[in-house]
Structure formats: C-alpha cells, structure tokens
C-alpha cells in the first residue's frame, strides 16, 4: 500500500507529477478542493456543512475537511493507497490526518516535497500567467504567495522529517527526470 502526501510550492509541478504517479501506481489522486466540491455537489452531510462556509466566503474548518477526507479514503479505490495533493498545509492538519488514518488502520508512507528555487518558481508562474492570461499573477503577488507558502510549510516539513517520512526531491529538470527521482524515493 502507498499512502502518499505531495507537497511543494506553487509552480513546482505537483499537479503534473501527481497525475503521472497516480497512473503508474494505480492509486487515486485526492485533491481537497476537488473532494470539497464533490461533497457539496453530492450533498453529503459534510458537504452540506462545507457549503455553509463556502457560501459565506469563509475557509472550511479543518474538522470538516478531515471529515470529507475520511469519507473519501474509505472508498474502494483507496484500498491500495492514495495520493493527497494540497493537504495537509499545517502541522495541525497533519496531526489530525495522522489521527484519522490511525483510526482507519492506515498511515502516511511517504511525504514528497518538490524543491524548486524561488527564482525558477517565479519564472514558471509568470510564464503560466502569460499563457493563461491571469492578470492577478504578477511578480508581487507571486512573491507574496511564495513567502506565505514558505512560512506555513517549513514546520510541516519538519513534522514529516522527524517521523522519517519526508523525501526531498529536486523539482528542476525534465518531466521524466523529476518523475524518475520521485519513483526512486517510493521504491
């Protein structure tokens, strides 16, 4: 079984690499944003609760997100593992996730962090903004997003490092080079 967490700053290539990895390992990619929207659409108990916060423009509390993740990992396609993308983002969320998984007889096998220098991230994100025509992705807002990410994520990296679950992977290189490095960490 492979229960994996994918971490990395905006522009590191998480989404692209997660998709490839999930196909190769035959495990589902669980994106918290996607499962929140799905739970709301399906009007599950947790989805109805999440909708109250989303409609008010508030962040969905960790307890609700954890409840939705709990429902998702109980689905049949997760029996051989899963890849969590975009969660946890804080140590508190990681602790709650560990408790949830322990209660389900599971645990995180590996937390993969894609490392990409800020200058490269800036280049990628500005390029992506140009292609997608996103006016909000200018140099100032991108640097702010990266600063926020770095402040919030460093304690999370320590959390998984102290548990001997963290693998730091160089996210600079060709698609195949980075994929190969990730697969070596999972072997």
From Swiss-Prot:
Its EC number is 2.7.4.3. Belongs to the adenylate kinase family. The keyword Translocase does not apply. Consists of three domains, a large central CORE domain and two small peripheral domains, NMPbind and LID, which undergo movements during catalysis. The LID domain closes over the site of phosphoryl transfer upon ATP binding. Assembling and dissambling the active center during each catalytic cycle provides an effective means to prevent ATP hydrolysis. SUPFAM superfamilies: P-loop containing nucleoside triphosphate hydrolases. HAMAP family: Adenylate_kinase_Adk (MF_00235). ATP binds at residues 11-16, 128, 173. NCBIfam families: adk, PRK00279.1-3, PRK14527.1, PRK14528.1, PRK14531.1, PRK14532.1. Residues 127-137 are annotated as: LID. Residues 31-60 are annotated as: NMP. Catalyzes the reversible transfer of the terminal phosphate group between ATP and AMP. Plays an important role in cellular energy homeostasis and in adenine nucleotide metabolism. It catalyses: AMP + ATP = 2 ADP. GO terms for biological process: AMP salvage; nucleoside diphosphate metabolic process; nucleoside monophosphate metabolic process. Pathway: Purine metabolism; AMP biosynthesis via salvage pathway; AMP from ADP: step 1/1. Monomer. CDD domains: ADK. It is an enzyme of class 2 (transferase). InterPro entries: Adenyl_kin_sub, Adenylat/UMP-CMP_kin, Adenylat_kinase_CS, P-loop_NTPase. One of its GO terms (molecular function) is adenylate kinase activity. It comes from the Bacteria. Its main location: cytoplasm. One of its GO terms (cellular component) is cytoplasm. It holds the Pfam family ADK. This is Adenylate kinase. AMP binds at residues 32, 37, 58-60, 86-89, 93, 134, 145. The keyword Kinase applies.
